[in-house]
């Protein structure tokens, strides 16, 4: 490679020993020149993007809503299904849900309410909404809470009273209906609904007689999670049902509901994939409820409403998208994030299994602790309007659409985060909205009502 030498008189005059030193100027190679061009182009593109995109702080200030404002209106109305999920066990989470529900119901934007429960329990939540029977409601909350113990709470009990009040203020054609698509939580209300659907004379099937007596006495353990008395009663009934389907189909009050109950009982007798079951139940029950034409509000845990895979495993909402049930933009996902809050943690019992108290947690378990927190949560905290602030994350020109792991990446003290699991993803792949829930007290167990 030849180099061009340039003699510089001014420089050489300052050097000692009267020796002349040439200054060497190396010409860039073709490869180096190309690299410089690429770098310049990249910097230009980045500068253009920055010029047209807002900072996160500016964006959040322009896209935030106060849920506690009496004039609050949810900013999106065009959807097929909308979901709200947050960490379980904190009081203001239930309040946020009630505000969202009331706003959407009043605007006639949702027809069905899908809580994190099974078909049987949901059916009797509908009975409560009609009757106002608080004894029934308390028992429903106890069984509903078997799925999520942190929501077996006074706050959940009061939330349902609030839902009833909202529903009572609606015209008949605008009242919501509760539908359960989750795996069976306990056998009690599944069994009760089966008996209501299948009126069989005493003595025809011993398995049915035993099922009827079990529900009537109501003193057994209704757990589907081990070989309980109720599980064995239902096993025997399923055998008779399968052997005489024609008869049972001829007497049922609702074949679709009966078929779904039977299928879900059978699933409890073997290992099952919960998320797949939720998705399958949704599709099956859509025959009855026509979900595509009647929007639903879903209240489930954080993961179930994510719109993209996490650890390559598809959530309920992700399955709806991947199976072309709905387009991604037809699904709205709202994630709740806690700060300066506490959650219900454990229930305490004495040696006789009598309830004696509970514990709460305000560090681990809320997603905003110095040892464990969501990346980017400080941006929400610094721009909040009230204790319940809603942020629209996927509006036009949102920085959350561009290679961000905010609100999905979990930072851990002295441990590796889940950043690699989110490679190639961005915040709005998962959620459309975020609610910052501040200064929330922990839920109180439903058992506290009996004190």
Model-derived segments and their meaning:
Residues 1-4, 13-18, 23-24, 29-59:
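Bacterial Sec-dependent N-terminal signal peptides
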Residues 52-451:
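Compositional signal for N-terminal targeting/processing segments
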């Amino acid at each position: 490679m030849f180099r061009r030498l340039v003699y510089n008189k001014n420089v050489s005059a300052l050097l000692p020993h009267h020796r002349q030193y040439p200054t060497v100027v190396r010409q860039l190679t073709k490869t180096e020149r190309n690299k410089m061009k690429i770098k310049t182009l990249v910097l230009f593109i980045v500068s253009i993007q920055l010029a047209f995109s807002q900072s996160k702080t500016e964006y959040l200030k322009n896209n935030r809503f106060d849920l506690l404002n009496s004039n609050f209106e949810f900013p999106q109305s065009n959807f097929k299904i909308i979901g709200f999920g947050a960490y379980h066990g904190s009081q203001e989470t239930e309040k946020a849900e009630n505000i969202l529900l009331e706003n959407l119901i009043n605007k006639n934007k949702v027809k069905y309410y899908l809580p994190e429960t099974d078909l049987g329990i949901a059916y009797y939540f509908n009975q409560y909404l009609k009757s106002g029977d608080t004894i029934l409601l308390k028992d429903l909350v106890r069984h509903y809470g078997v799925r999520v113990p942190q929501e077996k709470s006074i706050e959940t009990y009061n939330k349902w009273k609030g839902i009833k009040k909202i529903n009572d203020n609606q015209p008949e054609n605008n009242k919501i209906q509760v539908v359960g698509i989750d795996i069976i939580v306990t056998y009690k209300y599944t069994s009760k609904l089966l008996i209501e659907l299948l009126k069989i004379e005493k003595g025809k099937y011993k398995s049915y007689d035993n099922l009827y007596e079990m529900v009537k006495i109501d003193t057994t353990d209704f757990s589907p999670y081990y070989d309980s008395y109720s599980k064995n009663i239902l096993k025997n009934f399923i055998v008779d049902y399968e052997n005489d389907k024609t008869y049972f189909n001829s007497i049922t009050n609702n074949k679709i509901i009966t078929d779904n109950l039977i299928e879900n009982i059978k699933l409890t007798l073997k290992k099952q994939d919960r998320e797949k079951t939720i998705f399958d139940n949704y599709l099956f029950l859509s025959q009855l409820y026509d979900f595509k034409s009647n929007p639903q509000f879903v209240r489930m845990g954080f993961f179930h409403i994510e719109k993209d895979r996490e650890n390559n495993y598809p959530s309920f909402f992700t399955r709806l998208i991947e199976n072309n049930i709905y387009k991604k933009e037809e699904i709205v996902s709202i994630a709740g994030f806690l700060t300066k809050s506490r959650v219900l943690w454990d229930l305490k019992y004495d040696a006789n299994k009598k309830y004696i108290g509970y514990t709460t947690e305000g560090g681990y378990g809320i997603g905003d602790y110095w040892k464990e927190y969501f990346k980017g949560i400080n941006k929400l905290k610094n721009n909040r309007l009230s204790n319940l602030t809603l942020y629209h994350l996927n509006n036009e020109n949102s920085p959350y659409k561009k290679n961000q792991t905010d609100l999905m990446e979990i930072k851990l003290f002295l441990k590796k985060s889940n950043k690699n699991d989110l490679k190639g993803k961005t915040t709005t792949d998962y959620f459309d909205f975020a609610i910052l829930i501040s200064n929330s007290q922990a839920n109180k167990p439903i058992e506290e009502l009996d004190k």
